[in-house]
Amino acid sequence: LGGGILNGETNALVADISNEAEKGSRLSLLGAFYGIGALGIPVLLSFLSEYYSFEIILQGTGMVMLIGILFCLGIRFPAPKQPQGFPIKEGSGLLKESSLLLLSFILFFQSGIEGVCNNWTTLYLGQTTSIPENRALLALTCMVAGLTVARLLLVVLFKKIKQETVLRTSLITAVVGFTLLTFAPGFARAAIGMVLIGAGLASTFPVILSIIGSRYASLSGTAFSVALVIALIGQTLLNSLTGIISQGYSIVVYPYMMIVSLLIMLLLFKRSLK
């Protein structure tokens, strides 16, 4: 619950304090720290576990979170957009906004693809290739590394290239990555494919949230919440669907399902720009 609120509110805050030219870049920079945490924290915890007990590490984690809270208490945040309270009528009306729903369903598939990659890639590589489990996990790490590096690069690219062009190119890059996985790859090809997938998925959240923040500036926090809830539903449903289909047919369908999902995202994005 806390993580979901933090995710939504930090994105909304960055969108609110950024002008139109900077919004995509700043949201991308914010998203890069997700990847840095995903890569760095497990390594840090593994290192600390050699010297400290689980209880000490957990207490230390709590202290770090408390320091973060105390730091935020001293920050001067922007004034509320709705000083008289939450506009229930306007907020509920967002659920009828076709533009918001189209953009949210792009995140539905984006979040679903990320979740499926994290949960099914190692099984796919284990059953369709001769790659050992430890190297399959390393290939999966390549996806997070690709996503993190790409988001850092996007901070610069968004200032020079239209975000619509960046998103289309990124999704096609992810399609190429999944295509590499369909050829029963060795480790090198699998790792390259996963880097391309991570890099290809990097721009979706920054671009879509930037557009939502611009179109629904007066209710950006609520609009972001709608989009992120739909995204989380997508992660759950696509994971379940992958499990059902892989049991009925074979895990070999996994990359093809992801390619179809990416093509749907491209179609939804094209429609959302009209």
Language model: regions and residue ranges:
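Cytoplasmic helix-loop-helix junction between adjacent transmembrane helices
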Residues: L1-A32
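Glycine-rich segments within core transmembrane alpha-helices of 12-TM secondary carriers
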Residues: E22-I41, I230-L238
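Helix-loop-helix hairpin linking two adjacent transmembrane segments in secondary transporters
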Residues: L29-R76
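Juxtamembrane intracellular "pre-TM" segments in multi-pass secondary transporters
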Residues: A79-L103
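Extracytoplasmic gate region of multi-pass secondary transporters
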Residues: S98-T141
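Helix-to-loop junctions at the C-terminal end of transmembrane segments
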Residues: A150-K162, S246
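C-terminal transmembrane helical hairpin of 12-TM major facilitator-type secondary transporters
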Residues: E164-I208
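A late C-terminal transmembrane helix in Major Facilitator Superfamily
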Residues: S218-I251
